Structures are given as structure tokens and as C-alpha cells.
Amino acid sequence: MKTLIISIQKGGLGDHLFYSHLPRIAKQYGGYNQVYISNDSIFRNPDTKKLVWELNPYLDVFTNEAGVFYFSENIPEGQNLLDHLMLAYGLDDHKRNHEPEIYYKPKLVEAFIHKTIYDPNYISYTGDIKYSKTIQTWFAKAGIVPDAQMKVLGGRAIEIDCGNRTSTPDLFTFCDLLYSAKAIYCLSTGTGTLAAAIQKPVTVLYGEGLQKAYRHSQLHRYINLGTDFTALDNIKKWLTKQLSLVMPVGKK
């Protein structure tokens, strides 16, 4: 009996989606009979576990056994991040430019069909941008006026001047919103990765310094807004990087 146990030590939605294609490939092409997610995996949001893994028909649920964790931002030419992770786990379906996979079927929500929505939320690094003016200037130059902005969830965010706020109670209804909206604009975060999983093209805004690994979907348009960092911001960035070197990877 050939068994693969995957451990994911980065807890974001996008982080888990980067591995979401592996159970299917392991069983269809890797000769694995069983694929598990280790219970030592980190989840920032319990909905991530439900959406990404519990609905995955190729996963044999969870195990208390330790699993294999691999991650790298150094992606060779001709691969995206999901391809690189597949190969790192000893798997290969001989396809490239993989997209993340989920098995939830999003519902069409009439209220969002004609809406252009901007999601200001992010948790990790979205490049060297942090000020509202940068995002607002890009929208203005592009002639785009968002109909609504997602509610700030409590992490970091780059809000714009938009009076209409919208929110969803869970990741499943957030999928419905992404699927239904006329257009989605977001930062480099799990929003774009989730959109790729439901085959929804979106526009991802990011700043200078964001690794190519996170611009992983051929469905999306990625817009580099350069940098708006001040000298003080650059000092803070350097200090954050030094701290990250001594923190456990799943806590970043």
C-alpha cells in the first residue's frame, strides 16, 4: 500500500491551495493508494480545511502521522509554483502551469453579477506597496470605478475611497461572490489563488519585490505597481525579514 502524507506548515488559504492538486496527481499518476493531510498542518481559517481538503475526493482525510512539507519560492524556468511543488513531492503528470483545485461548485448570486469588486485584504507580502493612493491612482488611470470594496478582515489591507462595503460569512459564499462578480481586483493574496481554483480570471495588483512564484496563474492579469515605500518603510521591511529568519515557517 503506497501512502503519501502531506504536511502544510504555512496556514493561509492560498498556501493550502498550492498543494490542492497533489492528491489527484498522486493517485492518477503517482501510483499512490492513499493520500492524507497531516493533522500537524496549520490552518488560519477552519473553512480552509473544509473547502480545500474535506471536499477533495482524492484525499483519504487526515492522519496524526507526520507528513512531508516542502516549499520554495525559487521556481525554475518553465514551471509555476504548483508544478514545482508537484515535482518536489516526486510526482509528475507531465503537464505544466497547473492551477489550484477545489471541488466546491460555486453558486451564481444575482446581486454580484454586474459588480466590479476590489478586495483590499492581504496577510503576507504583496510587494513594496502599502498606501491607498497607489491603488486609487491606478484605478483612476485605468478608468475603473469599483462598485464595492470587501470589508477589512482584521489583517493588513490597502483600502481605497469606496463607500460601498461588502462581505461574506465564510469561504464558500466568498467563492460564490468571486464566481458571480463582473470583475475582481485584489492584491497578491489567497483571493487570486482561490479565483484560479474556480477558473475565474481576476486582476492582481502587486508591488516591486514580489517573487514570481506568487504570480502563478495563467488565468490572471498581474499588474506591477512599482513601489511607494518610504525610507522608514524599507527599514521596517528589513527588520521584518530578519525576524522571519528566526520564526517557524508556519507562524509567518
Regions found by a protein language model. Name each.
Residues 1-252:
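Catalytic machinery of carbohydrate-active enzymes
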